[in-house]
Amino acid sequence: MKFTFKGGIHPYEGKELTEEKDVIDYLPQGDMVYPLSQHIGAPAKPIVKKGDRVLAGQLIAEAAGFVSANIHASVSGTVKTIEPRLTSSGSKVNSIIIENDKQYETLAYTPNDKPLDELTREEVIDAIQKAGIVGMGGAGFPTHVKLSPKNLDDIDFIIVNASECEPYLTSDYRRIIDDSDKVIEGLRIVLAIFPNAQGIIAVEDNKPKAIKLLQDKLAGDARIRVNAMPTKYPEGAERQLIFANTGRYINSSMLPADAGCIVHNVDTVYAICEAVREGKPLTERLVTVSGDAIKNPCNIRMKIGTNYQELIDCAEGFSKDPAKLVAGGPMMGKAIYTTDIPATKSSSAILALSEDAVAEMEPSACIRCGRCIEVCPGRVMPNKLATLAARNDIDAFVKNNGMECCECGCCSYVCPARRHLTQMIAGTRKLVLANKKK
């Protein structure tokens, strides 16, 4: 098996800026902001009020239903207010603001050292749900929901997505290098509740140290294998990852579980280990702060709720005026206009790019070269879909498989006419999904 997929691109990686640097531990100094919607599903409900004193690890907002997630304080301090605050999505979200007392007093956690074969499904799911763990690769889907398919016996593969195919991002790589034991234990905990499943850790072959480290530690483990995949973007996209590692194809109407797979990010399985083994809630994560406009690009172990500007200052600030600020990776991240934004559970990176790294070019007419079709991993025709989107022809857009687009950005990247193909298609997809909810 070749562990790859049709299409894709090879953009500048930029990982050399941070991949071999030690992770920096950062304790925040300013107010902490906790948006009540850091996940897919219903926003969490605050259970604290203005003036309450809280400790790090304390529950401050509880899940509002099954498809939702708990939120915990990551520092000790006093609840200042609950009000809408700007997030990296560009929208204002109701948020709990805590005045950081800089004491970092933490609740006592209850560890669980039961052997894997004695862990019950109920206690694993309960620990994950109480810890507020969500997918940390970007989507933010509540993990306890993902681990609750209709039939456990139908799940054949638990895949840890360690591809980290976005340029500049190296936090997952550092997590494997520095904390591989917890990553492996987190996967083994998940496998313990899926009796028929095999484990796969999928890593791109531009990370030979991580591959060798995992292979050495998993030597003799018949239930987990490490797949070294050819480096190509978007190898880490869920549908492409599943196809590359299992040969199974899923479309936009399916969930990975429909193909017998569950996919987790590296940081997610690490958090599962900490929740089950240490009783620790999700209050921190690794984030990459990088780009050619950052003075000291690095990975930071930060408290969730920390202000973006504090994290940039931790990386010694800007080395030059940034022309573009991005929350997440340069291909699928969100452009932001301010650094007064809180880091959330799904914050993987903050990028600051100078004019030299950002191409500002006016789009022109399609020249019908077909490059966008060649690189599209979703097997659709981006040029045609973008034209239908521009015409607002939603019926034809759906009929021509517009909903199969994963918004990876490959088409926009290669387009010689510099058409904003991904953005045009994404806008229409959003409209279709909104109409379905009515």
Name each model feature, range by range.
Residues M1-I47:
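N-terminal, Lys/Arg-enriched amphipathic/low-complexity engagement segments
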Residues T106, G135, I158-D172, A293:
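Gly-rich Lys/Arg/Thr-decorated short loops/hinges at beta-loop-alpha junctions or inter-strand turns
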Residues S347-P363, I373, P377-K438:
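Ferredoxin-type iron-sulfur electron-transfer modules in oxidoreductases and energy-metabolism complexes
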Residues G77-V79:
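Conserved hydrophobic positions within beta-strands
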Residues D101-G132, G137, Y168-L169, G247, ...:
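Flanking helices and flexible, charged tails adjoining ferredoxin-like Fe-S electron-transfer domains
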